[in-house]
Amino acid sequence: MKVLFQARPDFMKNPAGDTVQMVSTGQELKNLGVEVHLSADPNIDLSPYDFVHIFNITRIKESYMFFLNAQKQKKKIIISPIYWPPNAYLKREGASSNALAVWRHLQPMRARLVSECTLLLPNSHIEMNVLQNDFLKTAPFQVVPNGFPDSFIGATSQLFREQFPSIPKEFVLCAARVSPRKNQQWLARICQELGLPLVLLGPVNDQKYFKDVKSFSNVIYIGTLQGKLLSSAYSAAKAHALPSWFETPGLSSIEAGACGTVVISTDQGSPSEYFQDMALYVHPLDDISLRSALEQSFNASPLPLMHHIQKHYSWSKVAEVTLETYRTVIVQ
């Protein structure tokens, strides 16, 4: 089996959740014997491939070009939409006045991909329900969840403590792009009011926003971590908080939970389908909900969620589900 993955051209330069999903799935599929190639070329010759797998319809312009190329060459098309309507986020105070209009203007492109592809692979049933609500017609679908690296199982705090000995023993962690959608400024303010150190990991998307977040004296920014050091950071944290405007469901929340850390998550998007009643949920900009979750996190047990995530959401298991969907497409 030979499959071509296609995604936005800057998926490695500006890594985000779609990057992790695509690269992790591809690596695990290779371990299962699938030949996986990556390309951001909208005119690539598709004759060597059984089908095309396109990631992310939020950044629709590139995905639309991949889609047209596949249709032109009469190839089957699988789409991981990674979709959530950003209406509330785009209407927030300080947002660009035309951002929502641009989003709506591009919806017909998304509608075409969603209705004319061979198979949709949403990350949750909640995401699929939203797709069915936002678009008149949708292709057949199979839910394929997001995951965490199998190597994170059994992580301990030792490596992180050795590398960063000055960080307080008890701290709240947020591993995510530092950007308004991830809502770290709000998190920093509430943590400061509670006297809690906040450690931030991840790339900076918005320098002005980053400066605003860093203005809080309790914030410690340590850049981007990977592999064993990242899993050790999760393990060292008292809680991991991702109070974003929406998540599907938030890769760092899955990773933190797998490492045995209490998870505080936004209630917007699909987190509840993954974490059920084993996480603490907050509503964006509801100070009381975040303050309460942070206070509860220091006495909450991370073990039920850890066992649940480790049982269901490793990337190796995700790849097995993905491969089964590929087989159904090939025989169609």
Give the label of every model feature segment.
Residues 19, 197-222, 229:
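Short, structured helix-loop element that forms part of the nucleotide-activated donor/catalytic region
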Residues 224-225, 232-237:
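Short alpha-helical donor nucleotide-sugar binding micro-motif in glycosyltransferases
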Residues 262-265:
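Short hydrophobic beta-strand element within catalytic cores of glycosyltransferases
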Residues 163-182, 188-193, 199:
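Conserved donor-binding/catalytic core segment of Leloir-type glycosyltransferases
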Residues 132, 147-167:
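Acidic anion/phosphate-binding donor-loop and adjacent secondary structure
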Residues 279-288, 294-299:
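Conserved acidic donor-binding segment of nucleotide-sugar-dependent glycosyltransferases
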Residues 245:
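Aromatic "clamp/platform" in nucleotide-sugar-dependent glycosyltransferases that forms part
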Residues 100-120:
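Membrane-proximal helix-turn-helix segments that form the acceptor-binding/catalytic region
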